[in-house]
Structure formats: C-alpha cells, structure tokens
Amino acid sequence: MPKVKNWQIAREMNYPYPDKRPKKQIAYIFDTNKCIACQTCTMACKTTWTAGKGQEYVFWNNVESKPWGYYPLGWDVRILNLLGAQKWEGGVYAGKTIFEAPSKPEEILGYMPDERDYASPNLGEDECKDIIIDVEDHYIKGPVHNNWGFYLARICNHCTYPACVAACPRKAIYKREEDGIVLIDQKRCRGYRECVRACPYKKPFYNNTTRVSEKCIACYPKIENGEMPQCVTTCIGKIRLQGFKSRPDKVRKNNPMDYLIHVKKIALPLYPQLGTEPNVYYIPPVHVDQRFLKQMFGPGADKSVQLYRNAIKDKELIGALTLFGCTQGIVDTYRVEGDHTIGFDEKGKEIVNVPLTEPVFVRPAKIEATGAYLYNNT
C-alpha cells in the first residue's frame, strides 16, 4: 500500500492511493464556543439539498449534543472502540489509523450502521443526565461525568485522504482537483454502501428510493461563484468560516484559514487519529474536560483553549476570528488596519470591513433642535 504524508498526525501512513493533493483545498472552521444548536444550518442544508424522497433521515449537516449525542447513533464511540487504545508521543501519532489497523483482507477499518441508528437525528437532546445507566450493549458506559456539554456541528470533512474514495469498488467517488471537494458520481454508484461502511464520520448516506449513496457537495454551485455554502451563511451564531487552506508547506499568513489552522493552531481537526486528514476544523470549547478534548481534537487542544481564552490580547487573532459570519463571500486574504479587519477575495477586491470591537453609541437625552427629551422604553 502506498505511503502518504499526513501532517495532522505528523508522520507518513498507509493509504490505498498515491499522495496527490488538489490545487487548493476547501476547508471550514467551526467555533464550538458559540454554537447554540439552533439547527438553522441543519434546516438550511435540509431544505436546499435533502428534501426529496428517500432523504427523510439524510442530514448532510447535523448538530450533535456532546458528550452523549450522535448521528448516526454512537458513530464516534463505535469507531474508536474498533480502533482500540492508541497513543500520541508528543505531537506525533504513534498509534494506527483506520487504514493501518484492519487485518487482511480488509483495507479500511469500519462498520455498517444499523438502520435504527438513524432513527433520531439528535435534535434537542442536550440535557446532561444525573444518572447514566450502565447496561449490556448500551452505548453509554462509565462513571457519571460532571455537568458539562457542548454542541458539535458536523458536515462532510472533504478529507485529504477520504476513506469513502478508498473504499468504493465502482470508483464512483472522487476528489475535485480544483477545490478538493469530494463528490459521488451517482451514475457510477450502484449502492453497495462501502462508502457508508468505510467513512469513520458516517457522512455518506444511502437513499433507499434512488438506491445510490449521497453526501454533502459543499454547495459547490455557490463555491464556484465565490460564495460560502448554505450552512455557513445561514448560521445565526456566526460560528462558521469557509475558505481554502494552503498546502502544509506553502502556508500564507494573510489567509485566515491558514492563519487559524497552521500558524496559530487554534483550529483543530476532528479525530485526527483516524487518519483521513479531515478539512473541517474546530475551535474546542473552553469549559470541557481536557481529556475529552484531547481524545476528540488531538494533543493541541490545551494550547487551543488557552489561545482562545487570551484572544482579546492578540489583534491578529481577533482580526481573523471577527471574519466569522460577516460576509457571504469567500475571504482569500485579510489584514488588520487600526481597529478594523478587512477581507479580500481571490482577485484582491475588498469584500468585508468590520470593527474588531462592536462600537457603542450613546444617544443624547435631549434633541437640541426641537427641545424634545428622549426616553427609553426598555
């Protein structure tokens, strides 16, 4: 099996295809500290792309309540259980990825979810329970945890080394050279569901009506027009930013994605130990048990939390974070000028100019021209 360089685990690993990165790679950053699980992103995606027959339980975008929420049920605890206990040595992953762990003849470690695992999309299930019942074959095991929780928004990761691409016997799944978006050719797909079994994040879905698999297409018609996807532009919490990140050896500091991912390392991949090099990155929640965050986001979680807590002291960092939710256009470069952040598209055109701090306006108690006094009604 060929060797590829996965920068997220800081080493080479096995992958069925030779290393070939696209010209540019679509990437997202989600700030978990701001997500309120309003599901606006979920419904925006649902009404745009998956409102047809056979798509009743297809959620290309979903928001889960962690630590006990999943869609499909138990997706992450099940793949982690199959992978077994692994370890990091410093910043290097010393364990096995899903491409290295299986025994022959299997090439990818995975499982096929039961149809009932899709019965509940984890909408509104956000309560931390006092008592966790530990019973046979129950997904939730272990001691009662302190009352903390957070919301995890999930879409297809458009991975650099997609398990779905590696698993498809029909070669119906491909990664676009121009932007790194992973798509399924539905004319070639025969519905074998090997992509569903192989993807550790369980983001390909099988349509029982059309008998083919479907997945997030990253709203590529909008991307091709220089606009961010539906789930990003409709987010009322302004937790999302989409752009294109550079290759690990060609980082551009004035690119907000590169700055947050490669320079500051405040945005981290979800379960990097799985080995797919996902391209959806998360700013971890600051109030969650660090052991849980390290398992989910890797050994950089501690540093990321500290950076976020002290972000107000870093003008460049605040400048990049201020771009979240402030424009529908894709920001290619940015710079901080005075107390404002200015974002530019790929052609160098200014598309957004926002203050680092929201201005405060105090209206006068009296309008001198008319002599009228103003009163607050709130």
Question: What is each residue range found by the language model?
Answer:
Residues M1-T378:
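Non-ligating segments of multi-cofactor redox enzymes
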